[in-house]
Amino acid sequence: MEISTLQIIAIFIFSCIAGMGSVLDEFQTHRPLIACTVIGLILGDLKTGVMLGGTLELIALGWMNVGAAQSPDSALASIISAILVIVGHQSIAIGIAIALPVAAAGQVLTVFARTITVVFQHAADKAAEEARFRTIDLLHVSALGVQGLRVAIPALVVSLFVSADMVSSMLSAIPEFVTRGLQIAGGFIVVVGYAMVLRMMGVKYLMPFFFLGFLAGGYLDFSLLAFGGVGVIIALIYIQLNPQWRKAEPAASTAPSAPALDQLDD
């Protein structure tokens, strides 16, 4: 599959938006589910984009910045892996093996880009002292543009030079135990991501359902739609039986009968 010039331009524009979205966190364009889906739509393979994005989204559930520590770059990993998988006609498992090291490399690029933006912030402080508000706006937009180019430039390079033969040759050069290990690690990261989210939410009472889901997934030959339906049914039953969600029934008050009143009078 060859990428056309129009597709390359569209990938570059969306990569800029995804890179800026990883800082703004408003429209979540940097999340794998959105990024891979849009790349799949641009390259004409929406199904593969959605499948890869959904798989990577599960892996990236636990990726979050903690203080000055930067998380792996989900935007760069999603876009690069989606391009290589769709153009090279590779499997979703290969996409996971590609995304993990790319996310680690993007983490380094993120730190480098944030270091560069410090220069813009100092310049904005100086402009604020001189009441040059248009300069402040320009510096803020320029700093945001650095974050966009952080993802767009690697995506542009890959889009310009990638081909199906190149992807196959590159993957053939990687030892099988490396790609297999990355695929297994990707499966473990999904579990760890779910566990981190549940622990952060502080809902220990949901842990039995967490383990029940993985046991059912391992031993029952159900489709995802069937698992979703079973999950909804269990959730509804749980809400109906849990005293926390049940409305308190008003106590019935009955007036004493006439004979009872007569006995009290006696």
UniProtKB/Swiss-Prot annotation:
It holds the Pfam family EII-Sor. Keywords: Cell inner membrane, Cell membrane, Membrane, Phosphotransferase system, Sugar transport, Transmembrane, Transmembrane helix, Transport. The chain crosses the membrane at residues 3-23, 33-53, 79-99, 100-120, 151-171, 183-203, 219-239. The keyword Lipid metabolism does not apply. The EIIC type-4 domain forms the PTS system translocation channel and contains the specific substrate-binding site. The phosphoenolpyruvate-dependent sugar phosphotransferase system (PTS), a major carbohydrate active transport system, catalyzes the phosphorylation of incoming sugar substrates concomitant with their translocation across the cell membrane. The enzyme II SorABFM PTS system is involved in L-sorbose transport. This is PTS system sorbose-specific EIIC component. The gene is sorA.
